């Protein structure tokens, strides 16, 4: 009898979770997990049903579990600003208002206008490794690129960017919830406090002297007479900083790693760069940066043959859903011609990732720059994987060019 169960602390949770997902889909696609005190969903249809259902909440405070109580206690250590409403953790109508006010900065047209600047940044980073036979993609490209992009959007000067990346990394490291070690929590608490001090000053300065940047835009944003409160501006700015850094770094690292492990697909893309948009979608499906997320039932809800009771958590495995053969034939094969437009790497429903157009653009432009510059590119060693069971990615990816 197979006793497969989702184990976020297992040895393969970071290096390669996909074989474990396959076992779950085949033997225990829906099950109650005592460690999480949550229902685990591994199949595409069930995962999407949870994400799309209006009676599932993104607000973890609605959960009634020991796990959630531990998360709340952890948040309390970070102060009230960590519990302020954000698009990520709120429901309509609050979520609708926040998203409508913030979304103006991330429209496809706004991102399209950023493409030339993104290419300039990447070219500058590649100039920094010119003449070298080997370099680490994460250290030299994937790590600095998104922090430069989001810092420029927010109007953060170059000398402060290293602090922004450090703050972001420290906070993201706590996404393991109660599985996070006390020293990681303390480091995140200190970084969040530094971020609070910095952003409070930046917001006050923009109120006095508005600029052409995102912080000023959030202050000025108005919809039907509604504006963002001070706490909402602050929490939204921090959310954009964190979401715009770690996930994009992992997207780029995971994508390059996948291509180098499938040289036939790399050569296919090299021979036809018009495939780039669909290629990035397939790379997101195949090995996306966000592996899981959770929702809380507002009332008893039937999903996947079980009843998720009010206050219980539904933990959905996005990475598993994207490898479900019932949705994607031959899912373990990387196929850049697949065009998997309905993958769940960015989620689905009202909480679909607002920054998806920007993340796609950064990945597309980075891959094209690497292909155009280097006629030959290969791994100079195995990737080192890191992150959490929620957000995972290459921490080191040595390349030989």
Describe the residue ranges of each PLM region.
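Cytochrome P450
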Residues: 1-401
């Amino acid at each position: 009898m197979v006793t497969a169960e989702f184990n976020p602390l297992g040895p393969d949770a970071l290096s390669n979770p996909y074989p474990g997902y396959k076992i779950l889909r085949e033997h225990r696609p829906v099950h109650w997990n005592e460690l999480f005190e949550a229902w685990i969903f591994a199949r595409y249809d069930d995962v999407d049903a949870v994400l799309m259902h209006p009676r599932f909440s993104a607000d973890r405070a609605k959960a009634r579990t020991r796990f959630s109580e531990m998360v709340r206690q952890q948040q309390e250590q970070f102060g009230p600003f960590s519990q302020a409403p954000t698009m990520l953790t709120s429901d309509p109508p609050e979520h609708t208002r926040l998203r409508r006010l913030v979304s103006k900065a991330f429209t496809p047209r706004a991102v399209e206008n950023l493409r030339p600047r993104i290419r300039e940044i990447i070219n500058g980073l590649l100039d920094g490794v010119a003449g070298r036979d080997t370099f680490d993609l994460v250290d030299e490209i994937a790590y600095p690129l998104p922090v430069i992009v989001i810092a420029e959007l927010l109007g953060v000067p170059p000398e402060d960017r290293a602090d922004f990346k450090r703050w972001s990394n420290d906070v993201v490291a706590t996404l393991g919830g109660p599985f996070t070690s006390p020293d990681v929590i303390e480091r995140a608490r200190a970084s969040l406090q530094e971020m609070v001090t910095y952003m409070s000053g930046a917001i006050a300065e923009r109120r006095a002297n508005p600029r052409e940047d995102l912080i000023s835009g959030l202050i000025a944003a108005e919809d039907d007479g509604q504006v963002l409160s001070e706490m909402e501006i602050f929490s939204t700015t921090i959310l954009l900083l964190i979401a715009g850094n770690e996930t994009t770094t992992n997207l780029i690292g995971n994508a390059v790693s996948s291509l180098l492990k499938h040289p036939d697909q790399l050569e296919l893309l090299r021979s036809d760069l018009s495939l780039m948009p669909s290629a990035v979608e397939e790379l997101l499906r195949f090995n996306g940066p966000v592996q899981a997320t959770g929702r809380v039932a507002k009332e008893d809800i039937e999903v996947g043959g079980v009843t998720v009771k009010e206050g219980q958590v539904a933990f959905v495995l996005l990475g598993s859903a994207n490898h479900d053969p019932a949705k994607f034939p031959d899912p373990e094969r990387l196929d850049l011609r697949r065009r998997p437009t309905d993958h769940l790497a960015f989620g689905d429903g009202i909480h679909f990732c607002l920054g998806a157009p920007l993340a796609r653009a950064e990945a597309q432009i980075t891959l094209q720059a690497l292909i155009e510059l280097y006629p030959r590119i290969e791994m100079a060693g195995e990737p080192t994987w890191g992150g959490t069971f929620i957000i995972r990615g290459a921490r080191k990816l040595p390349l030989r060019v």
